[in-house]
Amino acid sequence: MKRSARNQFPGTILDVHKGATTTHVKIEVAPGIVFTAAITNEAAEELDLAKGGKAYAVVKASDVMVGVE
């Protein structure tokens, strides 16, 4: 699959948490480095995401969001 985004990180899905409208996906791209993405439930179902599966975290500079816990 080709993508225009240059920041692509292959990794392993650690967790998939489905909410009312949004699914949060945690992808470990290196030991101890985890990206969390919020996607629609429909997208998560289409991608058939599951813990232990392989996925890419794709980051576009114009689409980076910042949050704190």
Segments from the language model and where they lie:
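Non-catalytic connector elements of ABC transporters
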Residues: 1-69
